[in-house]
């Protein structure tokens, strides 16, 4: 389980498939970069996390808890190892970068 409370809330929301919880922790104007390409956050979250039933199992994290590697599963990609780097400001995640881990 991630040690940083915002990252933990993000992972918990994904695993619970709780869109309201995710958008509580993720800034409305958050940036999402997936495999080097900036994506529309609302479209990406819906496609990659919710309509595809995503699950994340964090297997390693940085000392500050803002970078994690996770076993990720969704109905699009199946099981893949992923890396996530989160940027936070105050009570929200301002953005994240993800890709193969």
Q: Language-model segments: what does each one mean?
A:
Residues 8-12:
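Amphipathic alpha-helical repeat scaffolds
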Residues 14-17, 36:
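Conserved short acidic donor-positioning loop in nucleotide-sugar-dependent glycosyltransferases
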Residues 42-89, 98:
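Surface-exposed, charged secondary-structure patches
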Residues 92:
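Polar, enzyme-active/binding microenvironments
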């Amino acid at each position: 389980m991630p040690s940083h409370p915002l990252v933990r809330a993000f992972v918990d929301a994904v695993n619970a498939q709780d869109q309201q919880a995710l958008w509580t922790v993720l800034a409305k104007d958050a940036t999402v970069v997936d495999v080097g390409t900036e994506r529309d956050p609302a479209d990406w979250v819906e496609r990659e996390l919710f309509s595809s039933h995503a699950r994340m199992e964090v297997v390693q994290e940085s000392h500050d808890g803002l970078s994690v590697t996770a076993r990720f599963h969704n109905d699009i990609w199946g099981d893949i190892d992923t890396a996530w780097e989160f940027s936070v400001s105050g009570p929200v995640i301002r953005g994240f970068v993800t890709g193969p881990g």
